[in-house]
Each structure stands twice: as C-alpha cells, then as structure tokens.
Amino acid sequence: MKILYPGTFDPLTNGHLDLIQRAEKLFGNVVVAVLENTSKKPTFELSRRLIQINNAISHLSKISVISYEGLTVDCAQDVNANLILRGLRAMSDFEYELQIAHTNKSLNSEIETIFLSTNTNFSFLSSSLVKEVAKFGGEINHMVPEAVERDLKEYFKKN
C-alpha cells in the first residue's frame, strides 16, 4: 500500500518527520510530495526543501521524496497512491483538513484521506511557528532536524 504525504514543508519540522516515520510503519511505502506553490514566496527554495527532507529521512528505506505542482489528487494518481496522509494537531486542523479531504474525494472518488493525530510532543509545532522562533534567535533544535536548524539560522543571519 502506498500513501502520499503532501505539504510545502517550509521547513520540515520534527512533527512532519514523526508522521513520516509512523506512516512508514503503518502503510509501507510513503511518498513525501513537496508542493511548489508559485503563488507564495517560500523561505527555502524547492530544491533546498527536497535536500532537507532527503537528509532527514536517509535512515528510512520505504520513503521517496518528490515535488509537484497542481492538485494533490493528481499527484496521488501519478504516483499510484490511493491514500493521502494528513496530520492533525488540533480541532481547528480537522475542520480545515476535512474540507480539503471532501474536495479531494469529489475530484477523485478512488483516493481516501487518512488523518493521523500528531505526537503530543509535537502538537504545538508548525513551520510558521518554527520560523518565527528562529527569526528572533530562539532555540529550535527540539523542533526541527539538525540540517534544517542550520539552514534556518543561516537564513535569518542573512535576512
């Protein structure tokens, strides 16, 4: 069974990484799909985010990382995944993610969305929050993989 885990991952957090590891155990093959959203200016270019994720998952054998543009259901179909993984931190995430899941189902009835609650150790994490803490010099080593921490510190030193 193959599951698609889509997101912008700008940057990858330990919460994302935890979901990837748990999904590998539950579903086998996991495709991490990094969205290139041309309407937003990301902190890290797509190529850097792909490197960050590949570095963080190098110890995992059933994970692949790709980039995509457009509809997530089209990406899932392209990689032959009939499941889409979404992480839930709070009830507010559920309301938003459920709308997206219903939209995806209306576009492709063969694809199901699976929700996994985040590990309580990471339930407060978001990429936006991590960037905010890093911007003001706060400690983020418990929030992101080591390489992402280095990249964020370097980014905010320059900007």
UniProtKB/Swiss-Prot annotation:
Alphabetized UniProt keyword annotations:
ATP-binding, Coenzyme A biosynthesis, Cytoplasm, Magnesium, Nucleotide-binding, Nucleotidyltransferase, Transferase
Q: Any keyword Nucleotide-binding?
A: yes
- Mention any one GO cellular component term assigned to this protein in its UniProt record: cytoplasm
The keyword Transport is annotated on this UniProt entry: no
Q: What is its main location?
A: cytoplasm
Q: Where in the cell is it found?
A: Cytoplasm
**Residues of the site described as Transition state stabilizer:** H16
UniProt-recorded Gene Ontology molecular function terms: ATP binding; pantetheine-phosphate adenylyltransferase activity
Q: Where does substrate bind?
A: T8, K40, T72, R86
A single GO BP term for this record reads: coenzyme A biosynthetic process
Pathway stated in the Swiss-Prot or TrEMBL entry: Cofactor biosynthesis; coenzyme A biosynthesis; CoA from (R)-pantothenate: step 4/5
Q: What class of enzyme is it?
A: transferase
State which Enzyme Commission number(s) the record gives.
2.7.7.3
Kindly indicate where the leader peptide sits in this chain: none
Q: Per UniProt, where does ATP bind?
A: T8, F9, H16, G87, L88, R89, E97, F122, S123, F124, L125, S126, S127, S128
Q: Which cofactor does it need?
A: Mg(2+)
Record field: catalytic activity: (R)-4'-phosphopantetheine + ATP + H(+) = 3'-dephospho-CoA + diphosphate
Question: InterPro entries attached here?
Answer: Cyt_trans-like, PPAT, Rossmann-like_a/b/a_fold
Q: Which family does it belong to?
A: Belongs to the bacterial CoaD family.
Sum up the protein's function in the record's words. Reversibly transfers an adenylyl group from ATP to 4'-phosphopantetheine, yielding dephospho-CoA (dPCoA) and pyrophosphate.
Q: How does it assemble?
A: Homohexamer.
Q: What is this protein called?
A: Phosphopantetheine adenylyltransferase
Q: Which organism is it from?
A: Prochlorococcus marinus (strain MIT 9515)
Q: What is the lineage of its organism?
A: Bacteria, Bacillati, Cyanobacteriota, Cyanophyceae, Synechococcales
The record's gene field reads coaD
